[in-house]
């Protein structure tokens, strides 16, 4: 059942996830320059944590709070798409291909690792 407490937990952890995403994006931009390593990092981490939570059979309320709140706001499909469009407008087509391939590869790898770790945790 969806309670006020559960909604508050999603809200709180969503804020924390958004702040974590912002911090990683700023750090990566300062450290690595224009290539969107920050987006790559937060989406990979979100895939890892989300798949772990599902495979570990976390109970519904914590899964909603951590998965829907923290992980949902940490990962950013909209920023990935915006970055691809920005690179396209600048004619950085090779970087688009690299970014998309890296995003898929790291996302799939992180998901597989998260599933394995979650299954081991649940066992």
PLM region descriptions:
Residues 1-123:
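Membrane-interface helix-loop junctions in multi-pass transporters/channels
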């Amino acid at each position: 059942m969806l309670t006020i407490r559960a909604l508050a937990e999603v809200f709180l952890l969503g804020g924390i996830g958004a702040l974590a995403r912002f911090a990683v994006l700023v750090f990566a931009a300062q450290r690595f320059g224009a290539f969107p390593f920050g987006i790559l990092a937060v989406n990979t981490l979100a895939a890892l944590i989300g798949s772990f939570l599902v495979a570990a059979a976390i109970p519904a309320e914590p899964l909603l709070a951590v998965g829907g709140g923290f992980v949902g706001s940490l990962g950013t499909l909209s920023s990935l798409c915006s970055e691809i469009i920005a690179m396209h407008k600048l004619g950085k087509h090779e970087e688009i291909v690299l970014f998309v391939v890296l995003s898929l590869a790291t996302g799939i790898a992180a998901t597989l690792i998260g599933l394995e770790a979650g299954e081991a945790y649940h066992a």
